[in-house]
Amino acid sequence: MILGTRGSALAIAQADLVTKMLEEKGHELTRNVIKTSGDVFTDRPLHEVAGVGVFVRELDDRMIEGEVDIAVHSMKDLPTVRPPELAIAAVLKRDSPYDVLLTADGSTLDELPDGAIIGTTSMRRRAQLLRYRPDLNVEDLRGNINTRIQKLKAGQYDGILLAEAGLQRMGWDMDVQRLPAEAFCPSANQGTIVVVTRADDEAERACSVLNHERSRMETEVERLLITDVEGGCIVPIGSFAQMNEDGDEIHVLVEVLAVDGTREIRIEDDIPVKNYREHALSIGRMLVEMGGKELVQEAVCEMSGCDDE
C-alpha cells in the first residue's frame, strides 16, 4: 500500500507513527510525499490561500486518482464536507487537544507586558487571544513548527501559540503554558490524527483496526456542532467535546468569535452519549439561531476584504 503525506517534519512524524502501527499488523507500505497548497504558499496568511482544506485537497485528489492508498492528516485540517469516494478509516487515540503558549523568556500569558508581540497562524487563536488580552499585538506566523520556533528564538516574537500535540509528536519537551479550553476553546479535532482511504477499499479494512472509538465519537461530535455554521478551519470557531469518565455523557463547548475577539456566540452543555448525534446537531442549530452563521460570514468577509453594501 502507498501512504501519502505532506512533507513537513510534523506530517512525517505522524506518517511514521501510522506506518509503524500498520507494519506491526503485518502490512507493507511505501511512501509518497506530496506538497499541498498550504505548504507552497507560506508567504501569506492561511485565510488568503484559497478555500478550505488547504493541507488536504491534493492528497484527496491523488487518492481518488489511485496514486496513493492511505493518507495521514491532522484531523483539524480535514474539511467537514468530504468527497463521497473517500472514507475516514481510522481516528487514532487523541493526543492533547489544547493550545500552549511558548515565550522567549518563560513568561505566562498573564505576565507578558502590554503590547507584547504574539505570533499565531490561526484566526481562532488570534481572536481568543485578543478577547483575553486586547492589549497584545497579534501577528501572523507561518511556516512549519521548526520555523515558528526559530522565529521566536530570533526575537521576532515575544511568544507564539501552538498546538500542544504538535510538540508532543515531535518529541520536544519545552517549557510551555497550557491554555485552558474555557478561554481557548480548541479547533474541532485538534490533537487528533486521522487515516483516510478510498471507501470500501482493502486499505480501509486494513486501517480500521487502528481506530480509537472514544476519540472517534468525540471528534464526530465536534464536527457536528459546527456543521451548520460552516466556515472551515480558517475562521474563528472553537469546538471541543470530552467524554466523562463514566462514558455516559459528553461535555461540549462551541463558540464563534469576531476576528478582533470583541464578540462571541458560545454554548456549553453536557449531552448524553445515547443519541449523541441528534443532541450535537441540535446544539449546532441553536448556534445558528443565536447568530453564529452571520458572525462566521462577517469574519470571512473581513478576512477576504470584501465591501459591505
Swiss-Prot record:
UniProt GO BP: protoporphyrinogen IX biosynthetic process
GO MF, one annotated term: hydroxymethylbilane synthase activity
Keyword terms, alphabetized: Porphyrin biosynthesis, Transferase
Modification S-(dipyrrolylmethanemethyl)cysteine, positions: C233
Species of provenance: Methanococcoides burtonii (strain DSM 6242 / NBRC 107633 / OCM 468 / ACE-M)
Protein name (record): Probable porphobilinogen deaminase
Cofactor dependence: dipyrromethane
Primary gene name: hemC
Catalytic reaction(s) noted: 4 porphobilinogen + H2O = hydroxymethylbilane + 4 NH4(+)
Additional remark text: The porphobilinogen subunits are added to the dipyrromethane group.
Function text: Tetrapolymerization of the monopyrrole PBG into the hydroxymethylbilane pre-uroporphyrinogen in several discrete steps.
Family statement: Belongs to the HMBS family.
Pfam families given in the database record: Porphobil_deam, Porphobil_deamC
EC numbers for this chain: 2.5.1.61
Cofactor binding note: Binds 1 dipyrromethane group covalently.
Disulphide linkage map: none
GO cellular component: cytoplasm
SUPFAM superfamilies named among the record's database cross-references: Periplasmic binding protein-like II, Porphobilinogen deaminase (hydroxymethylbilane synthase), C-terminal domain
Organismal lineage: Archaea, Methanobacteriati, Methanobacteriota, Stenosarchaea group, Methanomicrobia
Pathway(s) per entry: Porphyrin-containing compound metabolism; protoporphyrin-IX biosynthesis; coproporphyrinogen-III from 5-aminolevulinate: step 2/4
